[in-house]
């Protein structure tokens, strides 16, 4: 069962059907998403919470500010052998809010490190998770048999599992994921504010510009809650980023060519990590 039939939930549904031959049913409070998911064959049937007890797996793929509430509600209805997973890109707040539920052990806090800038059921992709990382948090609090099932699902989707604490997860994702979205959003906003001629933007934009602002097409209803839920870490990342931007601005204003070159060389090291 998938709750939330957008990009991630829909892609998971496609993977579960093709790789594990699951019968996938779904819930989404957006009627249009439900109809699209049914029409596209992402789910076979719409159901409600009364049928959760019969599910082997319930995947919660709603916006991050609603995940804890939905997980707690799902845990109220699950059968003894039901695995509940989420896919939120912020983990600490979710884990804290689910911690006291009597059936906490049936929950595996997960984050598939994959996505695109598109949203909704029509954005769902088979193989979206292929070769990507599945972050699992607080695994020591999950029932080991259900955790094994989560690991088996991750393996079947050809994902690389990384276990970590919610605190570490949220800190690292602020730098490698959330900050890049802020940067892309604000770059897009800056260009739109300064370059009023949309035709010029389209005609002169290089592939470098297009790839840099690609994330600016991401859905605000998804990303606003992420920034707010991970506010402390995103602010830390932004502070460091702004410090580097201010330093680069100073070097440019004072014509420090060697220092500019050195800054670029230092940044180039990232390609050795991201081969």
Predicted segments with their positions:
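Hydrophobic Val/Ile/Leu positions in short beta-strands of Rossmann-like dinucleotide-binding domains
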Residues: 1-2, 60, 136
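NAD(P)+-binding Rossmann beta1-loop-alpha1 motif at the extreme N-terminus of oxidoreductases
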Residues: 1-49, 53
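Short beta->alpha hinge that forms the Motif I/post-I loop of the SAM-binding pocket
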Residues: 29-30, 62, 87-89
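Rossmann-like NAD(P)-binding element
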Residues: 49-85
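Internal alpha-helical scaffold of NAD(P)-dependent oxidoreductase catalytic cores
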Residues: 126-211
């Amino acid at each position: 069962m998938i709750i939330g039939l957008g990009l991630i939930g829909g892609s998971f549904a496609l993977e579960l059907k093709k790789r594990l031959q699951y019968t996938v049913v779904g819930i989404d409070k957006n009627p249009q998403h439900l109809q699209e998911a049914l029409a596209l064959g992402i789910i076979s049937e719409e159901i409600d919470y009364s049928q959760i007890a019969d599910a082997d797996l319930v995947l919660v793929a709603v916006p991050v500010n609603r995940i804890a509430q939905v997980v707690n509600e799902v845990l109220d209805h699950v059968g003894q052998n039901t695995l509940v997973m989420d896919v939120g890109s912020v983990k600490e707040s979710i884990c804290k809010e689910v911690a006291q539920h009597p059936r906490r052990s049936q929950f595996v806090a997960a984050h598939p490190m994959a996505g695109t800038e598109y949203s909704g059921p029509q954005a769902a992709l088979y193989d979206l998770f292929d070769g990507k990382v599945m972050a699992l948090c607080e695994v020591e609090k999950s029932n080991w048999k259900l955790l094994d099932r989560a690991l088996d699902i991750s393996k079947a989707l050809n994902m690389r599992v990384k276990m970590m604490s919610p605190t570490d997860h949220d800190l690292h994702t602020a730098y490698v994921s959330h900050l890049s979205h802020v940067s892309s959003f604000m770059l897009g906003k800056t260009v739109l504010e300064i370059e009023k001629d949309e035709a010029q933007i389209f005609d002169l934009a290089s592939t470098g510009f297009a790839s840099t602002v690609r994330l600016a097409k991401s859905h605000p209803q998804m990303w606003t809650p992420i920034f707010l839920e991970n506010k402390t870490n995103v602010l830390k990342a932004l502070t460091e980023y702004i410090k580097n931007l201010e330093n680069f601005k100073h070097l440019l204003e004072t014509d420090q060519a060697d220092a500019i070159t050195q800054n670029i060389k230092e940044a180039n090291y990232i390609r050795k990590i991201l081969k």
